[in-house]
Amino acid sequence: MKSSKLFALAGVTLLAATTLAACSGSGSSTKGEKTFSYIYETDPDNLNYLTTAKAATANITSNVVDGLLENDRYGNFVPSMAEDWSVSKDGLTYTYTIRKDAKWYTSEGEEYAAVKAQDFVTGLKYAADKKSDALYLVQESIKGLDAYVKGEIKDFSQVGIKALDEQTVQYTLNKPESFWNSKTTMGVLAPVNEEFLNSKGDDFAKATDPSSLLYNGPYLLKSIVTKSSVEFAKNPNYWDKDNVHVDKVKLSFWDGQDTSKPAENFKDGSLTAARLYPTSASFAELEKSMKDNIVYTQQDSITYLVGTNIDRQSYKYTSKTSDEQKASTKKALLNKDFRQAIAFGFDRTAYASQLNGQTGASKILRNLFVPPTFVQADGKNFGDMVKEKLVTYGDEWKDVNLADSQDGLYNPEKAKAEFAKAKSALQAEGVQFPIHLDMPVDQTATTKVQRVQSMKQSLEATLGADNVIIDIQQLQKDEVNNITYFAENAAGEDWDLSDNVGWGPDFADPSTYLDIIKPSVGESTKTYLGFDSGEDNVAAKKVGLYDYEKLVTEAGDETTDVAKRYDKYAAAQAWLTDSALIIPTTSRTGRPILSKMVPFTIPFALSGNKGTSEPVLYKYLELQDKAVTVDEYQKAQEKWMKEKEESNKKAQEDLAKHVK
């Protein structure tokens, strides 16, 4: 579910009935096979787990390629390709023993080779040579890797990864990272067979070619058809096949138009689980007939947001009619008071209700980029630490609630006050009003269009259409993705405001969120803020992002005291919140579903590619014949939480055994 954690905005909706008709039912087949049928929303542009930065790829490859460790259903790190591991007492050297029964297989299930320690070395070298989008995860962590990527050293053997023998791979870090093992679930640290890689050349990991990959995971990819379907089959020779309970997985593409279809397809057996849309015309009737089966899932750690393009270069999709309007919009977005007016004037409960309905709107709301309960120290959640820092930025933050599941930002009076300050300053710069803000949206995705329309309504009502106009650009899905999610560089980011992306954490540390928009090296500055990192960007300087980077860097340099580290990251998050450069909106989960998945059997994690809160990982997943009831779910949740606490405690105690 999480490739480097860049997500296209979820909540799109259902596939056409004709598409689903081709899929088998969600129960057992005539041969007694278990089939899981679900949906997907975004086609991958490749299957290259070593270089990608997109969830569209990882949602597929994380089911077919295993790394060193994975998550169990309680979120613990358990053996995968590594049957054992150790860390040196100084925290700088991690050593993993590769299991002897780990094999590579073709897409047809034929054994190709054993998985060896050298495969992990080959994988990282390939990622470095190809300038992987996910290098940010490890480039400054592994000794010598940054120098190799920058060309300061040419010999990869000088990088801190070694195959000590066929079964042992060792990593040497620049500084201790208590969360290092959580990074091993990510594709950039996964193995690849060198002989196969060389044989495929540029055809390695093609988007629609299952034969362009080798498989060492629980499933084999059998077919992938753009805007149609993805199919997996259980790997019969997988070393841990007893924990693979679903024989086939069939995913169908959603086009986002008919929001009544998911429930219909669940009821007729076409889907094993269905995301529900309370704003659909049929939901009221569904509540009457299946009220005991409508379950709201837990909020996860993925944060969707609205980004601000502070350095827009392209204007193919725009309602602006003059260079003066373009210049005025850019000056406005560079003004913090203006951005805060947007943040405070945006009714995010109304926005979320377009997806989750009035009753469920609050269940997905989020106020911080880093979720407030993501980490804890000294008895305080991360959100509490941020609040202590945030109030020092001004009175506007004193009564703001940063907890999940409520809108702590929306305040029309604050919005008007901030806008008044901004307008006075901007008029002195010759800015023309109203400010026109282009916001692209997939015109075929009903709930996406409704959300953007809701944002337009609340902002224009609060700030006045004579001051701010949201110009909705309704485009084809591919057009929207190509100028947001899939844009190759900042020049392709053709928007002023965008809610088309989100971020999920790669590992268990606040840096996994906050590093990604550092102006010098952040991988998502173009996606969220409209400029390419690594440049001496004038707009980034204007909004103070280099000051933000200093805060993040200082936090990252604290490697001995976790409480101090988190406190420093809280200071960086407080700066980011005050800047209003990105406006968090919702989590991915916390939404109503109908399901025949046995509750809490999928692998769980708040970060990484091997744990999820959504049905995008299929190892461990178990199915039942009838729809889960609310009572069953609540009892299972209570039982799982108790078991999780006990299991996590034992896992923490067992860590001492790995220090050598």
From Swiss-Prot:
Signal peptide (from-to): 1-22
S-diacylglycerol cysteine: lipidated positions: 23
GO molecular function: peptide transmembrane transporter activity
Keywords: Cell membrane, Lipoprotein, Membrane, Palmitate, Peptide transport, Protein transport, Signal, Transport
CC annotations in GO: ATP-binding cassette (ABC) transporter complex; periplasmic space
SUPFAM superfamilies reported for this sequence: Periplasmic binding protein-like II
CDD domains: PBP2_OppA
Main location: membrane
Function as written in the Swiss-Prot or TrEMBL entry: Part of the binding-protein-dependent transport system for oligopeptides; probably an oligopeptide binding protein.
Annotated family: Belongs to the bacterial solute-binding protein 5 family.
Protein name: Oligopeptide-binding protein AliA
Organism name: Streptococcus pneumoniae serotype 4 (strain ATCC BAA-334 / TIGR4)
Organism classification: Bacteria, Bacillati, Bacillota, Bacilli, Lactobacillales
Gene that this sequence comes from: aliA
